[in-house]
Amino acid sequence: MPASSPVVRDGEYAARGDYHREPDPNWEFYPTYLAKLKAVRSWLDRLPQDTRVLDAGCGEGVLVDEYAGRLAIEGVDANYSSERVRQASLTELPYPDNTFDRALCLDVLEHLTFEQQPKALAELHRVVRRGGEVLVSVPNLAHLQSRVHFLLLGRLIRTAAEAKHPGDRPVAEYLEMAARAGFQLVDRQGIFPTVPVLTRMIRKSPARLMPLHRALTRLLPVPGWCFLNLLHLRKA
């Protein structure tokens, strides 16, 4: 995309602007977002220079801009386009087969419908070379607090309103779907085990209680208990 291309914002970006560039410290998931970025940066930092990377569903392209000087990285998003971000659907990625060595898909799949999710994973599998790897982050519908809520009240706690996360699932279902798409699970990391009461406190005062958030993730990193899961996948 030429450097003179204007920035185009649709959907939530039209209403809120480039809100991921300076996230609100009062956002209830601010500590989880920062912990995720730290883990993703660690993964990207280990890649050799000029590795071809796709950030699928990259939003404003925060990581694309950050790593453009070292990696051959580009982004796609359904609601954003700029110099380094191409506007396109994740279910129809505008790239030939086996284009990329690595790919990111961070907090994206839950925004797709149940019907769209397997198509998006199939597209990621198609555009990544054999042996290539994909790092996926997804919220887990069956996190610890949600399970307790189900036992007491008979329903799980959605990770966001249905209109925002129409594809909300337990992480086990994402893993099954990834396997059907042809991916092998290399590693799995949990962020923010939702211990009841403590979770409510953190979500009410996210910036102030960030040390508590970090302590919980360090002491109880059981992925199935965590609100967010990072799935490190490999194309077989």
Kindly give the residue locations of the regions a language model identified:
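Conserved N-terminal segment of class I S-adenosyl-L-methionine
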Residues: M1-P96, R102-L106, P118-L121, G167, ...
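Short catalytic micro-motifs in class I SAM-dependent methyltransferases
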Residues: D107-H111
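A short glycine-rich, Lys/Arg-flanked "PGG" loop and its adjoining helix->strand segment in the class I
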Residues: P118-R130
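Conserved beta-strand signature within the Rossmann-like core of class I S-adenosyl-L-methionine
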Residues: G131-V138
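A C-terminal cap/extension of S-adenosyl-L-methionine-dependent methyltransferases
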Residues: L135, L151-L153, V186-A236
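Short "lid" loop at the C-terminus of a central beta-strand within the Rossmann-like core
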Residues: N140-L144, I191-P193
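Acceptor-substrate binding/catalytic loop of class I
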Residues: I157-E173
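A SAM-dependent methyltransferase catalytic signature shared across enzymes that methylate proteins
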Residues: A172-Q189
